[in-house]
């Protein structure tokens, strides 16, 4: 009995220690297919390597939040950091700018990463 209680206490201490680890998110913005002006595509924002799990992600068109944005389920890696994919359909052209804005406890404020159509 004592052994199982001790193991439970150790497990709780270990799990509570995981909460103290904070990792800033890595942000990648890319299109599903090579961009062609006037042709429908998908804009993706892959956010990875962050901890804790609470995070805000917005896809932007000319600085404004885009509608109909979907996302994957929150998942975690072997190192217990989290990752997500946000995506939406869009039609690129020469005049519009697209970006992904992320806010997380590890950041001093929201971080915006622009989509580079040449990547």
Swiss-Prot record:
Q: Where in the cell is it found?
A: Secreted
Per the annotation, which location comes first and is thus the protein's main one? secreted
Q: InterPro entries annotated for this entry?
A: B2Microglobulin, Ig-like_dom, Ig-like_dom_sf, Ig-like_fold, Ig/MHC_CS, Ig_C1-set, MHC/Immunoglobulin
**Which segments of the protein form a coiled coil according to its record?**
none
- Where in the sequence is the signal peptide annotated? 1-20
Subunit relationships: Heterodimer of an alpha chain and a beta chain. Beta-2-microglobulin is the beta-chain of major histocompatibility complex class I molecules.
To which protein family does this belong? Belongs to the beta-2-microglobulin family.
Q: What does this protein do?
A: Component of the class I major histocompatibility complex (MHC). Involved in the presentation of peptide antigens to the immune system.
The name on file for this protein is: Beta-2-microglobulin
Q: What species is this protein from? A: Chlorocebus aethiops (Green monkey)
Q: Name the encoding gene, please.
A: B2M
